[in-house]
Amino acid sequence: WSFSVTAIRKGYSKLPSNVKRWINQYIGLNAILSTLEHFTGWIEDGIYQACKRAGMPDWMAWTVAKALTLIAL
């Protein structure tokens, strides 16, 4: 999800300011994306730490965290 949020933010930043203002006023896109980005990162970090505590090597814990986050979120 964080990759999607980054891509949306990049495209959003290229919009004219009046369009961004309208989107923020009626949709609150920035707030939605910030919340999604925050919780997605928080969940992914939690999964990663749990995998590390279970004895997985870094690469495996990272892969499992990314895969589970992609599937679940």
Predicted ranges, named:
Residues 1-73:
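Mature secreted bioactive peptide module from preproproteins
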